[in-house]
Amino acid sequence: LKPTHGLVPYTGAFPIESTLDHLGPMARTTADIALLLEVLAGEDGMDPRQYRVRPEAYTKALTGNIEGLRIGIVPEGFEWPGLSQADVDDMVLRAAGRFEQLGAVVSTISIPMHRDGIHIWNAISIEGATALMLKGNAMGTNWKGYYTTSLLDSFARGWRTRANDLSETTKLVLLLGEYMQTRYHGRFYAKAQNLSLKLKAAYDAAFQQVDVLVMPTLPMKATRIPAPDAPREDCIARALEMLTNACPFDVTGHPALNVPCGMSQGLPVGMMLVGKSFGESTILRASHAFEQSFDWQKA
């Protein structure tokens, strides 16, 4: 589960881009995720990302009843050119149909700007990560909160002695981010942050009509890790190809949950449930009901 931005404090964790970074629980079952979130959520008084967060008793939402819940299938989350696999799309659509059998109201809701989310994310993450990691030594400046000095020291040592161990993707991000800052002086970062407000508004408008958005978590099944001697272009492509549906909600801060919904060719397929800001209880409720309805490993 990626909770609403700021619901879980980020204190002490390694940051990448403060407006995108989230921490959340991972577990085998929805019940365990809900229980973990009850422990993790809430203000700690040290993380400036947290603003009027609203933690709840998430385990109480796991009633198994989703009668009348409005589920919206987002077509823009399917059929990504050159990325989406037909078996993944089909399995997620069938899984979404199962919600109807459980009493929910399932419909299609188009959000054209969803396709722009990855481009907005790229502009923010590339320049933001460069400023925070390269020039800010992983913690940055100009914010009030708890600075983890041990992390600063450790990262500084790594820069001095092991910078070449950074992944090909990270090296590209830092080089491109430095170029964008030097050449355009933050203009495209600023434009992307402004567009993030429009993207959030587009999803919020959809949430006037539905309670939960549905799409594949990844457009494809798990791919092979590139060989150690693979061209850097292949390494970077493998690293970034999986982000298309997930990263827009880093940008907007909406909660998003991966729900296993079946197996194809021996590999798991994930369905992503997205909720309103601080709507974790709703997507956990939907996930729990779905999870209880069948054995996804035999689907």
Feature map (PLM): residue ranges:
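Short glycine/serine-rich loop segments
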Residues: 1-43, 252-263, 267-270
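A short, well-structured catalytic beta-strand-centered motif of the EAL phosphodiesterase domain
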Residues: 271-276
